[in-house]
Structure formats: C-alpha cells, structure tokens
C-alpha cells in the first residue's frame, strides 16, 4: 500500500476535526452577558489584591444599581430565567465573595433583535475595593461577564 494514500484520510480527518472545533467555539462564543454599573462619582486606576484595574468610585451607604444583557435572549418566558450576580471584596490580599443574588430576566428588543435584560441593586455598607460579575447558567458552557471593579469610599 502506498504511504501517501494512507496519509490522505488521516489528513482529511484532522482537517475535519479542526473545522468542528472551530465551529463549536464560534457557537459557544456567540452567547454573551454584560454587566453595567450605574452612577459613580469618579474613575481612577488603583491597585488592589496585587492587580491594577480601573475603578469606579461610589459613596458608602448608597445603592449601586446594575443592569445587563444576555445575548441571545434565553428561550424561556419572561421572568422565569435568572442571572446570578456576585460581588467580591479585596480582603487579605485576595478577592473573596461577600454577596450574591439572582436577578430575574426578561426579553427586550434592541435594534430589532430580542435580547435578555436584567437589573439588580446592591446596598454598599462596606468600604473597600470590589468587583461585580454576572453569570448565566442556561447556556452550555455557562457564560460570565467581565469583572466590573468599583471602590466604596467613606
């Protein structure tokens, strides 16, 4: 048997696997979630827990309002799907979870496309450096927003 002929099916199989992997990655990356922090009185670059980030500053005792979007909108009735919001604080040189809640979501039209929207509030009782993150577990793999860093001052 000719070795070149035996390698062709293997090369074709490898090329097919690469295309399948790229397609799966593209499908997974088409799902997204965003988280937006509302308000704040100033922005600054700071280092907390050994990492430098952009922080939005808020006064302690106030309420941090957040909202975000899940795209595409979950194929569930409005109010039945939920997004988990987690807040972590810099303590002892690392970020630790201090608060988490679930926000109900509903579909909205944005530029003629249905996407999912959610909103939630957090009472800022502690001073320090924090970040908030949103998760949606209805898609596999689950999707996670970028970290939104903020600082609560006195």
Can you name each region flagged by the protein language model?
Residues 28-63, 69-71:
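Short, compositionally biased P/S/T/A/G/V-rich stretches that sit at domain boundaries
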Residues 61, 78-80, 125-131:
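Extracellular Ig-like/FN3 beta-sandwich strand-entry sites
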Residues 96-113:
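Solvent-exposed serine/threonine-rich low-complexity stretches and specific carbohydrate-binding patches
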Residues 12-23:
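Bacterial N-terminal signal peptides
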Residues 2-14:
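Bacterial N-terminal signal peptides that target proteins for export
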